């Protein structure tokens, strides 16, 4: 199973080289089956099968049911946990949403991941509980756009990020919460109060400002301006 990235040139090159390496093993019989998944497979799923026929199946970024059913048919097995941790056991990445609706001029993420959709808060909190029972103490909360979390889950289109972080912070055993990849436009300012009030929410916030020049921001389709960014920084 080769997991790929199709976002930047170096990552695409590394992904292709890895697929070709295992395609050679597939031809020689050293590998019984070869599957490819992830961003590259999602973005170029029409072109790649003809170029690399040794791959038995190509799966897009969200083809979870297809991956599971195909592998289960070929390799029946029992997996002891819903999630396998690949980081050091004390910390884990916690993805709370997938996709992006921003469509910045320079970014391919919406083409790869599709439109933004949030995970249900109950599902996320349950995953946190499961992971803390296995020894995880630090959670890196990630998404392509943290600022948009929850807007698709309520009719008022309001962010649910602050409430979600509070609920994660309430879970026994959670020592650190660190927030990654917020978008400056529509940033939920009530989150700043949560960061200030909760001792297990780190004084850390990853926001991609990208630029401060209004003409450049307009060309980039970033939907913010110098004044907005300055006001947001003052509020912080």
Feature map (PLM): residue ranges:
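Gly/Pro-rich active-site loop or hairpin
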Residues: 192, 218-223
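N-terminal [4Fe-4S]-dependent radical SAM core
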Residues: 58, 63-94
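Cofactor-cradling patches in redox/metallo enzymes
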Residues: 2-66
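Conserved Radical SAM active-site core
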Residues: 12, 92, 113-201, 211-213, ...
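Canonical Radical SAM [4Fe-4S] cluster-binding loop centered on the CxxxCxxC motif
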Residues: 89-122, 236
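Single conserved hydrophobic/aromatic residue that forms the stacking wall/gate
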Residues: 228-236
């Amino acid at each position: 199973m080769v997991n790929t990235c199709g976002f930047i040139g170096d990552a695409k090159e590394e992904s292709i080289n890895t697929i070709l390496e295992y395609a050679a093993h597939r031809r020689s019989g050293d590998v019984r089956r070869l599957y490819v998944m992830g961003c590259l497979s999602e973005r170029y799923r029409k072109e790649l099968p003809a170029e690399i026929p040794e791959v038995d199946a190509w799966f897009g970024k969200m083809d979870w049911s297809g991956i599971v059913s195909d592998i289960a048919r070929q390799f029946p097995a029992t997996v002891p946990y819903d999630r396998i941790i690949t980081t050091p056991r004390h910390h884990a990445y916690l993805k709370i949403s997938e996709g992006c609706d921003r469509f910045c001029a320079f970014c391919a993420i919406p083409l790869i991941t599709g439109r933004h959709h949030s995970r249900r808060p109950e599902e996320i909190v349950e995953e946190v509980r499961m992971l803390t029972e296995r020894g995880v103490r630090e959670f890196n909360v990630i998404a392509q756009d943290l600022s948009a979390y929850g807007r698709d889950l309520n009719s008022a289109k309001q962010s649910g990020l602050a409430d979600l972080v509070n609920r994660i912070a309430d879970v026994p055993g959670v020592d650190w919460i660190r927030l990654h990849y917020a978008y400056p436009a529509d940033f939920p300012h009530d989150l700043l109060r949560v960061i200030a009030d909760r001792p297990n929410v780190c004084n850390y916030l990853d926001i991609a400002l990208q630029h401060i020049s209004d003409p450049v921001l307009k060309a980039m389709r970033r939907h913010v301006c110098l004044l907005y960014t300055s006001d947001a920084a003052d509020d912080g």
